Amino acid sequence: MSRLNLSFASCDYDHMRDLVSGKVRPEGIDLTPLTFDEPHLIFHQATHFSDFDVCELSFGRYVSLVSTGDNDKIALPVFPSRVPRIGALFVRAGSKIKRPEDLAGARVGLPEWAI
């Protein structure tokens, strides 16, 4: 069976180095890793030019694409650190939000949002 050729863009994260260096090889895949200094550079190239087969993409960027009708990307919930990066929500002092249920129907801010 032939192997699948995939380009993969990531930043130089310690938890991705073995994959990027080739020390860890995905079964059945010939991976061409591309490393970037900043995630926003990956996000820009991936969304404007579709330069990569696989890459990280912020949740904010993905949601903004889908909200404009751009359904060309498929999001996979893969968390190499084994947890989502956004582990907390911050609420304004004096807010009526005291429990997660209080967020139903509320607006939330994201650290990265592209329109």
Predicted segments with their positions:
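Short, glycine-/small- and polar/acidic-enriched structural segments
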Residues: 7, 11-115
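Small-molecule-sensing regulatory modules
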Residues: 1-6
